[in-house]
Amino acid sequence: MDDPSTLTVGYQTFMLAAGLSFLAGFIINAFIVAVNISEWKKGRMISTADKVFTSLGISRMVFQVTCLLNVFGDIYFYRLSVLFFASVLFLELSSIYSSIWLSTLLSVIFCLKISNLQNPFFLRLKILALNRVLHLIVASVVVSISFAFVYGLMAAFKILHNSTQETYLNVYTGLSVLTLIFWSTGPFLIYFISSVLLIICLYHHVSRMRSGRNTTSHLDTYYKTIKFTGFSLFSSTVYLIIDMTYTYWYDVFGLLGCYFFWQIFPTLHSIYLIYVTTKLRIQVSNIVHKLRRRCGDPKAPLETVFQ
């Protein structure tokens, strides 16, 4: 446990940079959530993917908050009761496993939409899944919260008489072993398989479009989707690896470095999501133009995704 009075200037600078990155990640995901909710409140149609993106953004916002609570709680508020550690662990586990399940659901939805298999079982699964997206989102979140609640209670009993970061680390290590076996492997395998199948399907679509001499603009859409799917799989893989090797990252980089690297990949994924999604990208562009106008540039244009 670090005493705030003994922190070096370099460490305090790194802590400030990490805190700003946590805040940036929170704001980026809050932006995604706000845009989609705003469209829904205006009565516009929200796609199944946008529903998952909104839920995923909320879970990532919660994760960013737990990163801040863990880092600053370890340094400044480490004398708080066991309730603090148990509550943070509950929020952290809820957000982590909600993100894993929601990312898996998103990959499966994309795979079902793109794939053109005519197998009766596959077609029935496709119709069932695409018509029950909201139910699947709720189920993913509820199961994750239930899991986090059970292990949060277990952690509360274990650290009842010793609420230190070392005890918290030992509890988290034990939970990581259990979740590696019973919780993370299953959804990640589904996520990996569906992502690979999606990339293969997209590649076949591109091959057929090339042979049919389709325009480059149509091919660019498929290329962007392939890149986004690959980057999503990479980000989720690193995110899960850090979760499962928490103690290694803690030993090498300390608590601050561990959470900094842990949260940076979901943040980068959210930034990339804004880049590839037209309505999100246009909203960012409009915000920039409004800022330019306030700074004295009256010619800065505003765009709209709805014509």
Please place each PLM-identified region on the residue numbering.
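Helix-to-loop junction signature of class
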Residues: M61-Y78, S103, S146-L160, K227-G230, ...
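Intracellular signaling interfaces of 7-transmembrane GPCRs
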Residues: E39-T48, S115-R132, V196-Y222, T278-Q307
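Structural signature of the GPCR N-terminal helical module
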Residues: A17-R79, L102-L112, K227, F234
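Fourth transmembrane helix
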Residues: S98-L102, L128-I159
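Class A (rhodopsin-like) GPCR signature focused on the TM5-ICL3 interface and adjacent 7TM helical core
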Residues: T104-L105, A155, I181-S211
